[in-house]
């Protein structure tokens, strides 16, 4: 019994070590994607805080990969992904129906946001559809979402996050990755924090993704900001653009 308990403890320790392993190396092709001259100045000014090269390395986005940028906003990461996967790869900017409506209410038409990108990057496709019916033209290697996962929980979206995650799970290739970045909420916060503060608890995301069949394989701390304790709205002037953010990488089992 003691030997079995010891073996279980060692296995747990090894698994934890793998999840918290050192950050993967940034390759020259990743650096080149970030240095792409086609990126607008408004995007490059945000690089210091968003650390795009490190994000490419964490997600494992390399030439030839098929990637979905889920709820892509103005396309900050979409451009970088399209350059990173190269002509033999493919990137899909996936706009959920409710997300489309929200952008339009802000005077930001999704098709207009992507028009310039589609002219520049021939490997880019744009998808409009319900998140609970998430589907892609081909199986994908990586589904990425940054600073939007919490929104899916809000009343305005009126959907079940479990249905969304199950649909994403189905779209991925066996061994594919689901990468989620978002504003960290204090673990003592209530579930309504997604709407009041625009944050979400790390434990909530882990529980939801694992319930859909994913396995947590990596966590990153490149976007950690100790000055943000997770109790303020992310739009407060003293933390805007410098919020503490978690990085979680989940994998669909290979079999």
Predicted features, each with a name:
Residues 191-217:
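Conserved Class I S-adenosyl-L-methionine
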Residues 175-183:
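Conserved beta-strand signature within the Rossmann-like core of class I S-adenosyl-L-methionine
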Residues 64-73:
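Conserved class I S-adenosyl-L-methionine
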Residues 141-159:
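A short SAM/SAH-binding and catalytic strip from SAM-dependent methyltransferases
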Residues 121, 134-144:
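A short acidic, Gly/Pro-enriched loop at the edge of an enzyme's catalytic core
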Residues 227-255:
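Core SAM-dependent methyltransferase catalytic element
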Residues 82-83, 159-174:
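A short glycine-rich, Lys/Arg-flanked "PGG" loop and its adjoining helix->strand segment in the class I
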Residues 30-58, 62:
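Class I SAM-dependent methyltransferase Rossmann-like catalytic core
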């Amino acid at each position: 019994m003691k030997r079995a308990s010891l073996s279980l403890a060692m296995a747990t320790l090894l698994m934890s070590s793998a999840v918290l392993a050192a950050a993967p190396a940034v390759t020259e092709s990743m650096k080149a994607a970030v240095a792409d001259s086609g990126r607008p100045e408004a995007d490059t000014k945000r690089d210091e805080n968003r650390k795009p090269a490190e994000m490419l390395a964490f997600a494992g986005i390399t030439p030839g990969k098929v990637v979905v940028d889920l709820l892509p906003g103005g396309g900050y990461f979409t451009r970088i992904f399209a350059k990173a996967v190269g002509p033999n790869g493919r990137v899909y900017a996936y706009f959920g129906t409710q997300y489309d409506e929200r952008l339009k209410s802000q005077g930001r038409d999704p098709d207009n946001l992507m028009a310039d990108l589609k002219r520049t990057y021939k490997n880019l496709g744009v998808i409009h559809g319900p998140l609970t019916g998430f589907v892609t033209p081909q199986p994908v290697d990586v589904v990425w979402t940054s600073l939007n996962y919490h929104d899916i929980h809000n009343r305005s979206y009126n959907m079940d996050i479990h249905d969304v995650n199950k649909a994403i799970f189905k779209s991925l290739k066996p061994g594919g990755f689901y990468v989620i970045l978002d504003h960290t909420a204090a673990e003592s916060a209530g579930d309504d924090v997604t709407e009041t503060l625009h944050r979400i608890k790390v434990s909530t995301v882990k529980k939801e993704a694992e319930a859909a069949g994913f396995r947590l394989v990596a966590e990153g701390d490149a976007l950690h900001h100790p000055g943000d304790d997770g109790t303020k709205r992310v739009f407060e002037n003293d933390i805007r653009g410098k919020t503490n953010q978690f990085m979680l990488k989940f994998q669909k089992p290979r079999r």
